């Protein structure tokens, strides 16, 4: 199995938003509007998409395919948890 390393960057503007690119510090394939929205990328790590470890919120195969076709993958933050809904679901039978 071949190695497909990618560089992972976090956004300083939005917590939980990550940008994956094929090579460290190469953002030519990332549209200018996205770069402006993302902010100055903060390097997190290099990651082997073909390795045994899986990404937590994205599938390795999807990230690799996006990088190969469009040159980058943008991972959006998870939706905020609805605390009221969670509370009500947990306390349904206690009234």
UniProtKB/Swiss-Prot annotation:
Annotated InterPro entries: YcgL-like_sf, YcgL_dom
Domain YcgL: 4-88
One Pfam family in the UniProt entry: YcgL
Gene3D superfamilies: YcgL domain (3.10.510.20)
TM region positions: none
HAMAP family: UPF0745
Name of the protein in question: YcgL domain-containing protein APJL_0712
């Amino acid at each position: 199995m071949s190695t497909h390393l990618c560089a992972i960057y976090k956004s300083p503007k939005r917590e939980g938003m990550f940008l994956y690119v094929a090579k460290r510090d190469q953002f030519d394939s990332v549209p200018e509007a996205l770069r402006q929205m993302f902010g100055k990328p903060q390097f997190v790590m290099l990651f082997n998409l073909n390795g045994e470890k899986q990404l937590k919120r994205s599938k390795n195969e999807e990230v690799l395919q996006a990088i190969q076709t469009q040159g980058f993958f943008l991972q959006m933050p998870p939706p905020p948890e609805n605390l009221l809904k969670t509370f009500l679901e947990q306390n349904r039978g206690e009234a």
